[in-house]
Amino acid sequence: HMLQLLALVAMEPPARLDPAAVRDEKVKVLRSLRPITARDVESHSVRGQYGAGAIAGQPVPAYLDELGRASDTETFVALKAHVDNWRWKGVPFYLRTGKRLPERLSEIIVQFRSVPHSMFGDAAMKPNKLIISLQPDENIGLQLMAKLPGL
């Protein structure tokens, strides 16, 4: 699912709007993914299992307690991926998924590079972002660099 979304965001426009052409462009992206070597695993990924906690004030058990046996299966994974092609060279893609997170959310955030200088003096400006929300509400939003009114 996450790789499908990454491929859709990173693919080139297909020559035709038919399933085969879209699939071919997505495959090009997936083939361009930089492999994560054993040496890079620690610096490019995080994995874990949820522990005991509470949901809506009710206690919930840890993953291993629910399972009733030892397991190395992840319930959370985050990784930094790179698409090694001319368009995405040097641009990291961050993918995160997990069970029992604080909110059920699926979104794609494209964070644009910061401008090299600010026309508003030394004010720290947040980067522009394109936010594509898939779950729980479908939405497309744009957060733009802006300053508070006044000098």
Per-segment meaning from a language model:
Residues 1-151:
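Secretory/organelle targeting and membrane-embedding segments
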